[in-house]
């Protein structure tokens, strides 16, 4: 298991004010689970200054992304590789690194532009996801040419990026790695699962309460590097003090339903504690896939 932590400090901000860095409680971990031989998940927690100051990541060489300056945003990212062998892990790593380079360069100016430019910001996030897709496809083609063993469609990954630019959380995702928003006992799934099962639900061909049991529940309809890549973007108000952002790969949600996630978030003592509690539940129930969990909270005023 790989885990990283940035603990909150003294709490002094007023309700609804932008939290300081030392008020944020951030934690992320990843675990291979009990079945898979390799962990193909990657994650990242960082703050964007002019570039990125890495607080937590599973990426092997993040130093080139780092630089300091005034904080512009906070980033949470998860990527769940598919494709077998080392291809899935390479795909998730490439996607994560590519979108972060895009965020720390092309998107640097957006946080200062104001809410009137939200559509431009969301368009840029879509472009960042498509840039990651192009990078993974290029790597897959090079691998296929070099080895003759992999097709250009054999490397793929999910990708979910949440970028907190006060007072909004902007989310772009491809695949079924989820972003949740929790406040005052209410858990909302921000992202839409891009799976064949969810497509059937949307078309009215499958009841929503049967989607999790469907054989198509984890068959991706959209992925980075896959046959179809359709980034979706959304925006969430994060001014409520005590709200929690949770992100995870499907290694968690295969074993832990939303109701239990909400219960644990409602009783959470810290981001570290809740991530470990959810991981332990998934492992106790089989740990059939790689498991990655990230949590972020701006604590309530005391």
Question: Residue ranges of each PLM-predicted region?
Answer:
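PP2C/PPM-type serine/threonine phosphatase catalytic domain
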Residues: 1-302
């Amino acid at each position: 298991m790989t885990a990283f932590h940035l603990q909150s400090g003294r709490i002094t901000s007023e309700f609804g004010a932008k939290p300081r860095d030392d008020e944020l409680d951030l934690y992320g971990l990843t675990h291979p689970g009990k079945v898979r031989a390799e962990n193909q998940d990657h994650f990242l927690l960082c703050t964007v200054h002019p570039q990125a100051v890495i607080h937590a990541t599973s990426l092997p060489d993040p130093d080139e992304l780092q630089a300091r300056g005034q904080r512009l945003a906070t980033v949470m990212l998860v990527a769940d590789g598919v494709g077998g062998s080392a291809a899935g892990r390479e795909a998730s790593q490439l996607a994560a690194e590519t979108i972060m380079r895009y965020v720390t360069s092309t998107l640097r100016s957006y946080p200062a532009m104001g809410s009137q430019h939200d559509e431009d910001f969301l368009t840029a996030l879509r472009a960042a996801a498509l840039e990651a897709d192009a990078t993974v496809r290029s790597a897959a083609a090079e691998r296929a040419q070099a080895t003759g063993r992999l097709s250009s469609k054999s490397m793929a990954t999910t990708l979910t990026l949440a970028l907190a630019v006060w007072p909004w959380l902007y989310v772009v995702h491809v695949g079924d790695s989820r972003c949740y928003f929790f406040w005052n006992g209410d858990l909302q799934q921000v992202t839409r699962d891009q799976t064949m099962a969810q497509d059937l639900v949307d078309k009215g061909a499958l009841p929503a309460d049967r989607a999790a049991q469907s054989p198509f529940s984890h068959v991706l309809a959209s992925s980075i590097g896959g046959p179809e890549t359709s980034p979706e973007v959304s925006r969430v108000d994060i001014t409520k003090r005590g709200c929690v952002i949770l992100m995870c790969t499907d290694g968690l949600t295969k074993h832990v339903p939303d109701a239990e996630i909400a219960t644990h978030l409602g009783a959470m003592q810290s981001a570290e504690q809740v991530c470990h509690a959810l991981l332990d539940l998934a492992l106790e129930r089989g740990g059939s896939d790689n498991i990655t969990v990230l949590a972020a909270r701006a604590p309530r005023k005391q």
